[in-house]
Amino acid sequence: MIAVLFLAILCLEVDSTAPTPDPSLDVEWNEWRTKHGKTYNMNEERLKRAVWEKNFKMIELHNWEYLEGRHDFTMAMNAFGDLTNIEFVKMMTGFQRQKIKKTHIFQDHQFLYVPKRVDWRQLGYVTPVKNQGHCASSWAFSATGSLEGQMFRKTERLIPLSEQNLLDCMGSNVTHGCSGGFMQYAFQYVKDNGGLATEESYPYRGQGRECRYHAENSAANVRDFVQIPGSEEALMKAVAKVGPISVAVDASHGSFQFYGSGIYYEPQCKRVHLNHAVLVVGYGFEGEESDGNSFWLVKNSWGEEWGMKGYMKLAKDWSNHCGIATYSTYPIV
């Protein structure tokens, strides 16, 4: 059913009389298909090829403009090459902000000094990059990432936690599983449930199933959670003093879909209407510290092929770019 829906959307965005394939791109197209194991029927291939060519040429144009100094980041073809932007956003994001329950508020005024650079990966707080697959479950990966970091702070043991446990067991009244969710509700579930399973004991499947949680496989707990005021200054202090922080961003753009490297800045990015959850694991700047070269170090959940081995540098101190500070939270363990 989902595949049929996506194909219908694709047909709306790419006319059924798709243009004749560009023969000069035959080699690139076939290499890309082989690399990602893509197979299509005859009608579908024509549509998918048209989408892929459109994306390929968009990436090439952007990178020429990058060489001319018009952008600070590159784009790169990846596994999402045959997805329209509408398909991509529906399939690969998953943040749905809901009513915020009463919670603690981060007291950023308590911290007067923060370092100029932070990277929690170097201190052992961050698990390897994961892949949510074709499931809009970014909220679950963002939540487990922050919880993994806080459990490491407490126990000095870095244990990957189970996103599938969240997908299967939270209930449809608080999450929509592969159709989106909310990190704070994930923390509330772990608190109420008394634990969260390890990834090893409850591996990721990328679709909702019957809950199979067993308390003996739990490796984390939550006592409460904290909301961070919606400013980059408060977020910076939280990242510096607490550890990896769950945040949401606007990932609606082709430039985000095919981000390659460098400091990401998208003029059309919104500070509200956020749709994708990620994990801020640090911040810093490129070259000499100056205006315009600061970034947030963001861990995504689209595998290591995307971006900088699964990470992004997102523009920092640019009026809350892409809404990175609009909604941010972390658990108390």
Curated annotation (Swiss-Prot):
Please indicate if the UniProt record lists Repeat as a keyword: no
Where do glycans attach? N173
Instruction: Name the active site residues.
Output: H276, N300
The organism's superkingdom is given as Eukaryota
The feature of type site (Ancestral active site) is located at S138
Q: Name one GO molecular function term.
A: cysteine-type endopeptidase activity
The free-text tissue note of the record is: Sertoli cells.
Point out the signal peptide segment: 1-17
Compartments in which it is found: Secreted
One cellular component term (GO) for this entry is: extracellular space
UniProt keywords (A-Z) are:
Disulfide bond, Glycoprotein, Secreted, Signal
The protein's matches in CDD domains, at most eight in alphabetical order, are given as: Peptidase_C1A
Biological process annotations from GO: proteolysis involved in protein catabolic process
Question: Which cysteines are disulphide-bonded?
Answer: C135-C178, C169-C211, C269-C322
Q: Which family does it belong to?
A: Belongs to the peptidase C1 family.
Record protein name field: Testin-2
Q: What organism is this sequence from?
A: Rattus norvegicus (Rat)
Q: What is the lineage of its organism?
A: Eukaryota, Metazoa, Chordata, Craniata, Vertebrata
